[in-house]
Amino acid sequence: MLRFDILSTFPEMFDSPFSCSLLKKAQDKGLIEIRLHNIRDYTEDRHRMTDDAPYGGGGGMLMKVEPVDKALRCIEADRDHIPVVLLTPQGQVFNQEVAEELSKHSRIVLICGHYEGVDERIRVRLANREISIGDYVLTGGELSAMVLVDSVSRLVPGVLGNVDSAAFDSFSSGLLEYPQYTRPSEYRGWKVPEVLLSGNHKTIDSWRRKEALKRTWLRRPDLIEKMVLSEEDRKLLCEVIQVDSEVNNC
């Protein structure tokens, strides 16, 4: 089982996404456990303040170090043995490779930043890892935590009903996912590719691989550059590039 401990000043934000669909089923099966911790519960003033003005001046408020430290000590989050992740725009960009690495742990702690930022001592003294879900600004780390929990949970054995589902998701193979179709085979003149109706699984597998290479090359060529392509992949990709060149030259 993989346990997530999420520290947030707004834990109620997680009620809906964690109480339905795949994540709810995974929790019901005992495959993952999600514990929410309200950072305000670890404050000592009557207003339960988790933020304060920055030393030296400047706009905005910063998350205070004391309540975060107390929360981590209360839940026994030992940064020497488990990932204690600060969700921040300054962190390592989250991707499938990071998700796969995190899924191998039995416990992950997520600290959701908020306000203008966090006291630097949270970053340096309490967290042992920083992760960002992209180069854009969000109100807080809660949305980032939802993304991370969902992505990592899918990789926990037993969470997905079909063992092949995770393996064929976009990015799991380093490529974007190939096109997929379901019934009916024709609708308003829009037909499913004949190869998928042929029943020839070898041909279908080759078509899917070629389409995945094509989609990745057209939309995310940077992913192709990172891959170690097999001879068959190179052959299929050459066919894709040749066809695309002919179309563009017409």
UniProtKB/Swiss-Prot annotation:
Key words of the record: Cytoplasm, Methyltransferase, S-adenosyl-L-methionine, Transferase, tRNA processing
Top-tier EC class: transferase
Domain of life assignment: Bacteria
Keyword Cytoplasm: yes
CDD domains: TrmD-like
Stated role: Specifically methylates guanosine-37 in various tRNAs.
Protein name as it appears in the record: tRNA (guanine-N(1)-)-methyltransferase
Gene: trmD
